[in-house]
Regions:
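Conserved phosphate-binding elements of NTP-dependent enzyme cores
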Residues: 1-847
């Protein structure tokens, strides 16, 4: 048993609990009842902290520290691993393949059994002999001067003094460092922290009949020095690469030895040289720079930074546009969409070096200038490169992501993409869905040699792909960027990775793994969770899903209500025991005693939106009618295209049309009927703020009105306080000892940082003078400490405040304190606060 005594973290009421080890345990209860406080903030935090304390103090300073949870004791605890939904990697270089490490196994497989092809003609290529190299060099024009180079250092940092000493001892006279030839007797400038390429000059020759013997000897020497590699510097021409490994006899192309790093898009040896392994480029988009092409330039059609002054007749920008209009015979008052393509090309891409006469009158006088116009796109591109980081972020709102022209989104250089296994290169393999890959790996044809070498690697790949398939992610591809995954998908990927790691004796803490998962895939997930338990692990799952609760070995129901009214253990036991427990609301729903009523009469729509020809991601050119004025649910199995339709097409297109947002909608032909709406609002689960200074009162805007009330009291007027006095973000009214935080951080170096209440204000955030001002007997601190439920009664006679409070209560947040830091709110709570903020506004009926 894991024995917990006196857990008091957040809203937990000093609870004692025994959780069975090596079992599948579900923590359930109302939103905000304290499930996460017990599972993550208490059990996981303590398990992680104890593991950290077993490390040396030197190691601990690099790993960061964990605060000791507010609990008397926890016995029988294993090392804990948390699999939550928040820690998704947003790095564009991170993919499903890299986070699961399956891609690392594929890199190894392709390096060991892959068949290289010529990137130019596509023919399989094999190793070159010394004779073939001699023949190739003898084909050069007579009297061509060449240098035979042995590449001995490639892309490595350091001063490499020993390399130069050994070369000198061996009798060599010259080396080429980073493209420059140096004499070994001179001092060679080397930057220690820069990557260098070093080649020894083995021989220098002039191509002419009769040098074959010397050339053969020199080539053999070079190949021995550089492990079968040779570079030939043709003076006045290009450098030729030779290898005893692979070369194309037809095209004369030699490629490097195939290594695992050749297939890494995070390594210069494998990455596409144009996009550096990202697979895409950021480019300025005409549709974002000129969002409304029905407008003329004079009316402000050009919206991109640096060009808004085109509406000002006295600006230099307008003078250039006037000059172009005279030269190319168009009118700046004409709508942009009506210009011929030639005029659009001149405006966007420039005059191609042709100069136009610009008449400009500025502060220093007037003049005539001959200007070769570079084009709006090139101009803003230059401004973007020269801009500060903040301005770059602004410019990027006018840019879109386009696939790289060189690698077509496959991230790798052409030589790496030319290596195949079972007639597929590594990018094509990773573009298959997990479900397709399971079948392909079972049926793909390999030679006996390939099977022998790749047996162990393939075994690992098949096992890990199988785990992904088992958690209901059969629709994902290994090339999918992790930044595009939902919280539930990212969590299930980490779950599959943990099963692949094969750890035993661990306490896994999971946060609603079934979220976003279709019922069809739920059985797969539950089977996977049981497999993880059967390995010898303890599973603690925070969950509301009925199937998961019924499948669990043990359930802990926390409640009875949320927030201040929760934090107690209501019931424990098996699903059957919970159903029989009269105190458990969860049990009443599981047993069917309480049900959510299905409406007998449905509302009728007030109109329809029609999406025509939706083709984003996996959508098959579909037309969809969405009724307006009613509650509509878009559903389907995981990966069916729901988010592509709603988030990528519908939201982005309507945001662009109605909110003038700079968004690029997903691929579709048209949306009909949006003239019936006046705005669109997206409410997701992202935090309402990133710091403890953000809270429900500040987010909903109600704190401004509360501060106005305090500023209007007699005490405040007598002391000359304005509303700014009641802000904990400004000097004046806040406690300066803690800068309005209410807590002080004490750094303990090798121990966790300790947060203690401020000794001056005792955690109240404000100074004494500010706290003396009372409204209806309450200070500003007292108001921030109220729950939404209490605030509804307190502000019942102030409609503008009570309306917002009642809306927060109606979405089930009556237990949340007005000043509760946003960092303490769950994703669901943050989403409901956003929803309440919108619902409390006066409705136009067209949102």
């Amino acid at each position: 048993m894991i024995r917990i005594k006196g857990a008091r973290e957040n809203n937990l009421k000093n609870i004692d609990l025994e959780v069975p080890r090596n079992q599948f345990v579900v923590f359930t209860g109302l939103s905000g009842s304290g499930k996460s406080s017990l599972a993550f903030d208490t059990i996981y935090a303590e398990g992680q902290r104890r593991y950290m304390e077993s490390l040396s103090s030197y190691a601990r300073q690099f790993l960061g520290q964990m605060e000791k949870p507010d609990v008397d004791s926890i016995e029988g605890l294993s090392p804990a691993i948390s699999i939550d939904q928040k820690s998704t990697n947003r790095n564009p270089r991170s993919t499903v393949g890299t986070v699961t490490e399956i891609y690392d196994y594929f890199r190894l497989l392709y390096a060991r059994v892959g068949i290289p092809h010529c990137p130019k003609c596509g023919k399989p290529i094999s190793k070159q002999t010394v004779d073939q190299m001699v023949d190739r060099l003898m084909q050069l024009e007579e009297r061509t001067r060449i240098q035979l180079l042995a590449p001995i250092v490639r892309g490595r940092k350091g001063e490499h003094a020993k390399v130069f000493q050994n070369a000198k001892k061996s009798g060599y006279v010259r080396v080429r460092v980073d493209g420059n030839v140096y004499d070994l007797s001179e001092d060679i400038p080397m930057e220690k922290n820069k990557k260098h390429n070093i080649e020894i000059v083995v021989d220098r020759l002039v191509v002419k009949p009769g040098i074959e013997k010397r050339l053969t000897d020199s080539i053999e020497t070079t190949l021995n020095l550089a492990d079968g590699l040779m570079m030939v510097d043709v003076i006045g021409g290009e450098t030729l690469n030779f290898s005893q490994s692979f070369s194309c006899p037809d095209c004369g192309i030699s490629i490097d030895e195939v290594e695992p790093r050749s297939f890494s898009f995070n390594n210069p040896f494998g990455a596409c040289p144009v996009c550096h392994g990202l697979g895409y480029k950021m480019e300025f988009d005409v549709d974002l720079m000129i969002p409304d092409q029905k407008l003329s330039i004079a009316e402000g059609a050009i919206q991109v930074f640096g060009w808004q002054s085109s509406t000002d007749k006295k600006s230099y920008t307008r003078a250039i546009l006037d000059a172009l209009a005279r030269e190319y015979h168009f009118d700046l008052e004409t709508p942009f969409k009506d210009y011929p393509q030639e005029v659009k090309d001149v405006l966007l891409y420039g005059t191609g070096g042709r100069e136009v006469k610009v008449y400009y009158k500025g502060q220093r006088g007037e003049g005539v200038y001959d200007v070769a116009f570079e084009g709006i796109i090139k101009n803003v591109g230059r401004r973007y490169r020269e801009a500060s980081q903040n301005m770059k972020a602004e410019y990027e709102t006018f840019m879109t992501i386009t696939p790289c022209d060189e690698c077509h989104g496959q991230r790798l250089k052409q030589e790496s993409l030319a290596v195949t296994v079972a007639d597929k290169n590594i990018a094509e393999m990773c573009d298959m869905s997990v479900g397709e890959m399971v079948s392909f790996l079972e049926t793909m044809e390999l030679s006996e040699r390939q099977k022998l070498i790749g047996e162990q690697v393939l075994k690992e790949i098949k096992a890990r792909i199988g785990f992904l398939n088992d958690v209901g992610l059969d629709y994902l591809t290994l090339s999918r960027a992790t930044g595009t995954l939902s919280g539930g998908e990212a969590q299930r990927i980490r779950l599959a990775t943990q099963i692949g790691s094969g750890l035993v004796g661990v306490a896994y803490i999971l946060d609603e793994p079934s979220i976003g998962l279709h019922q069809r895939d739920n059985d797969k997930l539950i089977r996977t969770l049981k497999n993880l338990r059967d390995l010898g692990n303890t599973l603690i799952v925070v969950e509301h899903d009925e199937d998961t609760m019924l499948a669990a070995d043990y359930i802990v129901d926390i409640g009875p209500k949320a927030g201040e009214y929760g934090g107690e253990v209501v019931a424990t036991g098996t699903a059957k025991q919970i159903m029989k427990n009269k105190k458990s609301i969860t049990g009443a729903y599981l047993s069917g005693k309480i049900k959510i009523p299905v409406p007998q009469v449905r509302r009728k729509p007030s109109g329809f939106l029609k999406v025509v020809g939706a083709q984003e991601n996996n959508l098959k050119n579909i037309d969809v009618e969405i009724p307006l004025g009613i509650f509509t649910c878009v559903t389907g199995v995981s990966g069916s295209g729901k988010s592509s339709l709603v988030n990528q097409i519908l939201y982005k297109r309507l945001a662009k049309e109605l909110n003038r947002a700079k968004t690029k909608p997903g691929l579709h032909k048209d949306i009909e009927g949006f003239d019936q709406l006046d705005k669109i609002i997206a409410i997701d689960q992202s935090p309402i703020g990133r710091t403890p200074r953000s809270n429900p009162a500040t987010y909903t805007g109600v704190f401004d009105q509360i501060r106005d009330l305090f500023a209007m009291t007699k005490d405040a007027k007598a002391k000359g306080y304005n509303k700014g006095r009641f802000s904990f973000n400004k000097k004046g009214g806040r406690c300066e000892a803690c800068a309005g935080d209410g807590i002080i951080k004490i750094e303990m170096h090798f121990l966790p940082d300790v947060y203690v209440p401020c000794e001056v204000c005792h955690g109240k955030r404000y100074n004494r003078e500010t706290l003396e001002v009372k409204y209806k007997g309450k200070s500003i601190y007292d108001v921030l400490n109220m729950t939404v439920e209490e605030a509804c009664d307190f502000f019942s006679n102030i409609p503008s405040i009570s309306r917002k409070m009642e809306t927060l209560r109606d979405v089930g947040l009556g237990y949340v304190r007005l000043g509760q830091p946003s960092t303490e709110l769950s994703g669901g709570e943050a989403q409901r606060i956003k929803l309440a903020a919108e619902l409390s506004k006066r409705s136009t009926g067209k949102t």
